[in-house]
Structure formats: C-alpha cells, structure tokens
C-alpha cells in the first residue's frame, strides 16, 4: 500500500483525537466565570475569547509579539531563577516552535506549491524550496532546531535524574513526555542517517519523499550525516524504521493535550492575559 495513503489513514484519526483532547481542556477552562460574559454558555464564552483576542492583537500587535517572545518562548522570569533550567526550557520550546515553522514551510512548498506549479506557472518559484538554493537552508535549519530540542531534552532529563534539585517534583507524566521527545529525536536522526547511508531507500520512496536533494544527504544534515558513517554496513527493513518513527510520533501528538507540554500552547494565553490585566491597572 502507498505510504502516503497509510500515513493519512493514521493521521486523520490522530488529528481527531488531538482536537478531542484539546476540546476537553477548553471545555474545563470555560466552566469558570468570564468577566463580561457571566451568563454565557461555553460556546459563547469561547467565541467571546476569540473575538477579544483577535481585536486585542490587531490593536497592539507589537506588544503581543514582544510578550510571546520574551515571556513565553524565552521565559524571561525563569532566567532569574536558574540558568540551567532556563536554557533547557528555551531549547525545548524554541526548538519546537522553530522546527514547526520550518517544517510547515518545507511541507507546504514542496508538497503542495510544487504540485500546483504544474498547472499554475506563477508558482514555479516553489521549486527553489525543493531543488533550488533555498532547500539547503531548510535542511540545515530543520537539523539544527531538531538538535536544539534533543539537547534541551537531555538537559531536562539530566536535571531531573542527576542534579535533582530540592524543589523539583518529578511526576510520571513529566518523565513520559521527556522520554517521548528523546525517543522521537533519536529515532529521527537515526532514520535520517540510515537514509543517507542507503540511497536505495530514497529511490524506493519509502519515506514519502518524491525527491531528496543532495543538501539532505551531506554535512548540512549534520546529525544524520554523522550517524550515516556508522550505518553503511547495517541492514534494517526500511519499512519497519518508517513505522518505528511515525507511529510513536502520532501517539505523542494524541498524548500532547494530556501532558504538561500543553503549556507550550496555553502559557502564551495565560501570560498575555496576566500582562493585559496588569496593563489595565496601571
């Protein structure tokens, strides 16, 4: 069966479970009283928050972006408490955000615009993202930001199990989240290294890539390229490796709304809300 079909057959149920999990949390949050919409239903409260957030952002976009960068991604307050903890947190959060952005750009341009360019000539620029001068930068930054996530994860695990500061409470779900991330990053680099070491895997289109340019097979993909030097004589079923990485990735996506990593999504709303209240009182 075609890998694209298999992936989407697994992906769409995953999205449904993810949205359901997020919906449970949002429903719980909306049970509280909302100033300005005290008698509203949950759905009315939800629309109220969306409208208020949308209007607030466009009224002061610079302020919102500043708070998002300084307070959420780079967690300025945490820096004053512990540099080690701040660095681990920043590498994880910034790595996730940056990887997501680059991956979306790469996926949208090489997966959709390139295909549309066959019928729409003005989209021919998209080939720069697949085979042109832009592709090496996409490959490098995906590799680099993924490496930041890996380093941040290792630092967090080291802090929890080796340094073990007195105020730290290591809960089961913290451990699950960290080891999920560690597994996905290591397996991702391993599969990349195996793909580089065995060009026949790419030719067979096992990893969904219709084309893998040279930039994805050299030192620009430094993590995978390093591992590839040790994998040339190793033979593993490439289909197994694909499932070995993709299935846990989708499971992690479903688990995300139920983990403490949810704060990547919610902390921005909480921080911005607190800053808005403080700004109103001034």
Name each region found by the language model:
Residues 1-281:
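Membrane-embedded alpha-helical bundles of multi-pass integral membrane proteins
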């Amino acid at each position: 069966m075609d890998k694209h079909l298999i992936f989407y057959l697994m992906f769409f149920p995953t999205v449904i479970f993810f949205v359901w999990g997020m919906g449970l949390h949002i429903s719980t949050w909306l049970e509280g009283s909302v100033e300005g919409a005290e008698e509203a239903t949950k759905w009315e409260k939800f629309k109220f928050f969306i409208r208020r957030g949308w209007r607030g952002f466009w009224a002061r976009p610079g302020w919102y972006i500043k708070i998002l960068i300084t307070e959420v991604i780079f967690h300025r307050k945490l820096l004053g408490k512990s540099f080690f903890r701040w660095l681990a947190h920043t590498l994880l959060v910034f790595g996730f955000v940056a990887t997501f952005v680059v991956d979306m750009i790469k996926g949208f341009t090489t997966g959709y615009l390139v295909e549309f360019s066959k019928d729409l000539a003005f989209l021919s620029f998209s080939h720069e993202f697949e085979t042109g001068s832009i592709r090496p930068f996409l490959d490098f930054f995906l590799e680099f930001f993924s490496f930041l996530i890996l380093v941040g994860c290792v630092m967090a695990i080291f802090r929890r199990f080796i340094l073990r500061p007195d105020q730290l409470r290591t809960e089961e779900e913290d451990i699950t989240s960290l080891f999920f991330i560690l597994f996905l990053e290591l397996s991702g680099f391993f599969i990349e290294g195996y793909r580089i070491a065995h060009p026949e895997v790419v030719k067979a289109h096992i990893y969904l890539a219709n084309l893998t340019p040279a930039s994805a097979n050299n030192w620009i993909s430094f993590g995978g390229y390093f591992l590839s030097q040790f994998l040339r004589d190793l033979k593993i079923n490439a289909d197994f490796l694909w499932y070995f990485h993709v299935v846990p990735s989708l499971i992690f996506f479903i688990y995300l709304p139920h983990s403490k990593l949810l704060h990547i999504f919610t902390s921005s709303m909480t921080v911005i809300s607190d800053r808005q209240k403080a700004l109103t009182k001034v």
